[in-house]
Amino acid sequence: YHPYIDSYMDSIRGGEIESSKEIKQAMNYIEFKLNNPDVVIKVNMIDKAVELIERYFKITLYDWELLVIALIHCYYKSTDMVVFNKFLIMMGRGNGKNGFISAIAWYLTTHYHGVQEYNIDIVANSEKQAKTSFNDVYKMLERTWNKSKRFFYKTKEEITNLKTQSYIR
């Protein structure tokens, strides 16, 4: 399918990554969906997403994050609709969930994702928790503001991509 998908599926199925039966079932479901001849995987978009996220957020993405990014870019040729429209990320502390949400939220607002007005409201169990990811994006923009100011408008409440009119709040 794509190296990020294949590698993760092989690691789960081969036992290299410890996983639950539900994760193994998810691999079967992903394979079932991707075997549809109407599915296209947009490799260039995957590569660009990974490049931008790792460069701007100064991180190296985990294998599970690479899998999710790849699955985000699977579409039906006939409708250009996404194959996977919901993702549940449920894991213990310290596996990069907040950092990933920050980076992927930012990427999804860019013209590289290609969707106008792709708006993101970050929701969590508490306002403090929800602000963590928002603040990660805000700080990244602050750090790169000489370049980012051409593409984003930011306040402490909302970040707007000027080209796509997408926001994060």
Report the location of each language-model feature.
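Phosphate/NTP-binding elements of NTP-utilizing enzymes
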Residues: Y1-R169
